[in-house]
Amino acid sequence: MTYPERKAFVSRITNETKIQIAISLNGGPISIENSILQREESDAAKQVTGSQIIDIQTGVGFLDHMIHALAKHSGWSLIVECIGDLHIDDHHTTEDCGIALGQAFKEALGHVRGVKRFGSGYAPLDEALSRAVVDLSNRPYAVIELGLKREKIGDLSCEMIPHFLESFAEAARITLHVDCLRGFNDHHRSESAFKALAIAIKEAISSNGTNDVPSTKGVLM
């Protein structure tokens, strides 16, 4: 099946954050014409290959790392720029990046037609193993059980990691279940969860070989 372009650009500006996101669910070339970044960029979450362009700049290093993993293993091209009120804490930046990414995903996906709708995935990282299940249901709901013990990983509060996923699911209008099944290193637990989610999303948005709406209702809206 030949997919439509499945690209989107989202600009979200509040008193707390300024965010720009460009996404292509199919990978390939994307760009942001006018960058909002006024700081020196980090190359830690930047990757350009023949099939993907990924550049994540939220100002929170571990959040960049998680979004990079999500984009990489979903097969997306993704650029995220955020200027947030990090002098307060990481809450608004993390939450708003989740919201903006969910909005961009929903816009890029368009009508849920001709795709599998459901996806699931497992991903290990050393001793950690996570499971994710996704439904492109237009019924936003998230159940996130990561079992994190630390207060922070780098500059990212551990309580904000599930909240990012909840914010993404709400804005994307998808049902999302993510569980870390085992593991003792919180970095590994978190990263395996984002990779499992990527695998699940990649399956859910893949072709089902028809042009049908995958619902007994005949609509997902």
From Swiss-Prot:
Source domain of life: Eukaryota
Pathway: Amino-acid biosynthesis; L-histidine biosynthesis; L-histidine from 5-phospho-alpha-D-ribose 1-diphosphate: step 6/9
Catalytic activity field: D-erythro-1-(imidazol-4-yl)glycerol 3-phosphate = 3-(imidazol-4-yl)-2-oxopropyl phosphate + H2O
Keywords: Amino-acid biosynthesis, Histidine biosynthesis, Lyase
EC number: 4.2.1.19
One GO biological process term: L-histidine biosynthetic process
GO MF terms held by the record: imidazoleglycerol-phosphate dehydratase activity
UniProt KW Lyase keyword: yes
A Pfam entry, by short name: IGPD
NCBIfam families to which the protein is assigned, alphabetical: PRK00951.2-4
Similarity comment: Belongs to the imidazoleglycerol-phosphate dehydratase family.
Xref: HAMAP family: HisB
The protein's name in its UniProt record: Imidazoleglycerol-phosphate dehydratase
Name of encoding gene: HIS3
